[in-house]
């Protein structure tokens, strides 16, 4: 088991966190680092990936481009690779605007390959409901197929909840604990460095969420859309990377992803806006084992918080929790002044 620390200001959110066992997953817009949880989705130079992508089955039969052209064509994969390689997406942008910007090129390529298929008698869609489509309409179906398939490679929004390994970092107390007036909650993890959470207060089932260590480096954060779509991997590295000047934080974080329907995304220019209430999760009561008070935290507030935690811990075993007071030394260090077990 390990211990993780979370800094809080004196406010309603802190009191909700300790009363109701809440934790909140933040979006990029809510974080103090505008580059956090943000990275650049891009198309790498990967003809093999395009060959594989053309074999992916669509969610709607009308978009099955195998009805209209030879999806095994290396030439088609190569041409699509040439059109898209090097392209990037802006943060929160969907695939659709990029597809729209390349509509003429894509239509030209698909019409060529549809005509090639007809001439070579590669395919016959006479038994298809879409056999009466003209060539241009079929090309539009191919573009819609591409939009939907690629949307699967960029269909999520990501959120994080931050914890830390150092409870006595002066900068953290200054920035995140309201100038040493706030508190640090001590959380105990499971044996596999995770914490069990449930998405609703009334839910019964808890799911483990892993504490992941943040890496600090100044490299550009990028993600290959093709690789992500084909491998269906959870994005982790870009979400666990911050610039080096944040290294004093020694952060660990929980990650949450929200996936959107690729059919809907294929018709949208930007990612949907979501309800922040859906990002409040609940942990087990016993996950909180103690509290550390800031050097400028008042005695009245300490008594109030101890009373809240004491009441909650009275219903579980073992009863009690750790309580620590800190002080800020003249040389700028935060040290433990005193501690006790409150029962």
Model region roles, listed by residue range:
Residues 1-343:
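Partner-binding and oligomerization surfaces adjacent to conserved cores of proteins
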């Amino acid at each position: 088991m390990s211990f993780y620390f979370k800094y809080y200001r004196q406010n309603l959110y802190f009191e909700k966190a300790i009363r109701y066992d809440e934790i909140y997953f933040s979006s990029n817009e809510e974080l103090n680092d505008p580059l956090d949880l943000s990275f650049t989705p891009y198309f790498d130079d990967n003809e093999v990936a395009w060959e594989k992508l053309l074999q992916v089955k669509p969610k709607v039969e009308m978009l099955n481009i195998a009805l209209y052209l030879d999806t095994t064509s290396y030439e088609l994969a190569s041409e699509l690779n040439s059109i898209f390689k090097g392209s990037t997406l802006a943060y929160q942008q969907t695939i659709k605007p990029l597809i729209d910007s390349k509509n003429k090129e894509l239509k030209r390529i698909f019409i060529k390959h549809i005509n090639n298929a007809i001439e070579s008698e590669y395919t016959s869609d006479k038994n298809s409901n879409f056999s009466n489509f003209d060539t241009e309409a079929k090309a539009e179906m191919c573009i819609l197929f591409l939009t939907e398939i690629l949307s699967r490679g960029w269909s999520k929004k990501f959120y994080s909840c931050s914890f830390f390994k150092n409870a006595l970092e002066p900068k953290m107390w200054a920035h995140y604990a309201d100038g040493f007036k706030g508190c640090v909650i001590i959380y105990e993890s499971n044996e596999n460095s995770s914490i069990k959470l449930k998405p609703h207060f009334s839910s019964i089932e808890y799911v483990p969420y892993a504490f992941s260590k943040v890496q600090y480096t100044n490299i550009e954060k990028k993600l290959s859309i093709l690789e992500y779509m084909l491998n269906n991997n959870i994005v982790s590295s870009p979400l666990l990377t911050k610039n080096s000047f944040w290294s004093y934080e020694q952060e660990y974080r929980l990650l949450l992803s929200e996936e959107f329907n690729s059919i809907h995304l294929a018709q949208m220019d930007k990612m949907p806006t979501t309800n922040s209430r859906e990002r409040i999760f609940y942990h087990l009561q016993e996950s909180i084992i103690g509290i550390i008070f800031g050097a400028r935290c008042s005695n009245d507030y300490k008594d109030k918080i101890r009373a809240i935690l004491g009441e909650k811990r009275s219903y579980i075993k073992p009863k009690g929790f750790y309580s620590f007071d800190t002080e800020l030394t003249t040389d700028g260090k935060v040290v433990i002044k005193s501690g006790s077990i409150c029962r």
